[in-house]
Amino acid sequence: MFYRRPEQVALTFSMPAVICILLGSIFTATLPGSSTSTGSVIAASMLAYGILSTSFINLGISIAADRDTGGLRRLRGTPTTATSYFVGKIALVAVVSFAEAVILLAVGVLVFNLHLPSDPGGWFTLTWVFVLGTVSCSLLGIFISNYASNAVSAAVITNGPSVALQFVSGTYVPLVVLPAWMLTIGSIFPIKWMAQGFRSVLLPPEMVVFEPAGSWEHWRIFLVLTAWSVGGLIGCLAVFRWSDEG
């Protein structure tokens, strides 16, 4: 389990915050025509990476490890169904992701002058983006774990794509500096839309002009994250296995 691996816990909670501080400290210039620094934009977007880290990466690794050591095979001997197993895993991830979000929000507010939502609508948006992002990334983590033979191989197939997606999704660098083909690739995956949703409530309203569509596109964020959640669940139910023997 995640909480039984201290090194994994430490890496999960520290890495997004450390990367946020480093990148935010490097990119300090304000965006043209605004008073908001590039560091603030990165800090707001980094919440998406935090969720990806606690859900997709850690579930992919921990489930592959449990399968490799026989933990899932033993669990199969209980009344637990695959669906209830998924629900339990996502609930655990939600708690960890919430703690990660609190840490990143604290860094953003204290170091990069982010402002928490000032109205119920902003908090509502922050909440549903968080929930849908957690669910979609968790299900993708469960799905990808089926293609890893152990924790080591799972670390490779989860961390590799995750790092690449940060660059094309506007978390490590602002979207305004990315070429069109990178924007197209990033728009396929959940991380880009999660980051956009978080920026919409943590940055000043006028920052919307720096989004590719010139709009926060809340409706599209909802549709994309919901689609990935539904697709992820279907994929998990189709390929999930309790042991390496099937």
Which functions belong to the PLM regions below?
Residues 2, 6, 55-80, 90:
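Transmembrane helix boundary and interhelical loop/hinge segments in multi-pass membrane proteins
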Residues 82, 86-165, 218-222, 226, ...:
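Alpha-helical transmembrane segments and their short interhelical loops
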Residues 1, 73-77, 149, 183, ...:
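Short amphipathic alpha-helical coupling elements at transmembrane boundaries
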Residues 8, 12, 16, 37-46, ...:
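Residue-level signature of transmembrane alpha-helical entry/exit and packing/kink sites
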Residues 3-30, 39-58, 98-100, 160-166, ...:
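Hydrophobic alpha-helical transmembrane segments of multi-pass membrane transport/permease proteins
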Residues 200-246:
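Alpha-helical transmembrane segments of multi-pass membrane transporters/translocases
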Residues 23-32, 108-120, 148-149, 173-178, ...:
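Short helix-capping/hinge motifs at transmembrane helix termini and TM-loop junctions
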Residues 173-211, 219:
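Short hydrophobic, aromatic-rich alpha-helical segments embedded in or entering the lipid bilayer
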